[in-house]
Amino acid sequence: MEYVVMIIILLALFFIFTVFLNTRYSFDEKCLVLKFGLSKTEIPINQIVSIKESDKYGVADNIDYKIGMPYAQPDRIVIETTNKRFLVFLNGAQQFIQKYKRVSV
């Protein structure tokens, strides 16, 4: 019985970690979709001006929105659109930039 309770607790912690503490992203034909916790942010690809890596730890100039947890994920990306700037905390910044380049062509 003790093992069953332990397994349930571990599964619950795993679920919380994967859903609430990771920044997930996907690209479709027209939008970049960023998900963190229960929030979902859609950025039209045609409005993205630039995407670059950042070394800022939660503080950056003129950032309108922060997506993700600064200390749980090692990579930071600044997404600049025509009217907003996003600081995104995620894993795999290089893969993100490569996927964006393939989609934005």
Curated annotation (Swiss-Prot):
Record's subcellular location: Cell membrane
GO CC terms in record: plasma membrane
Keyword Protein biosynthesis set for record: no
GO annotation (BP), single: bacteriocin immunity
Organism phylogeny: Bacteria, Bacillati, Bacillota, Bacilli, Bacillales
Protein name per Swiss-Prot or TrEMBL: Sublancin immunity protein SunI
InterPro entries tied to this protein: PH_SunI-like
Entry keyword Membrane: yes
Residue ranges of coiled coil: none
Keywords: Cell membrane, Membrane, Transmembrane, Transmembrane helix
Phenotype when the gene is knocked out: Loss of resistance to the bacteriocin sublancin 168.
Segments crossing the lipid bilayer: 1-21
Record gene name: sunI
Pfam families: bPH_8 (PF23491)
Residue ranges that the UniProt entry lists as topological domain Cytoplasmic: 22-105
UniProt induction comment: Expressed during both exponential and post-exponential growth (at protein level).
Membrane topology (UniProt): Single-pass membrane protein
Role noted for this protein: Is essential and sufficient to confer resistance to the bacteriocin sublancin 168.
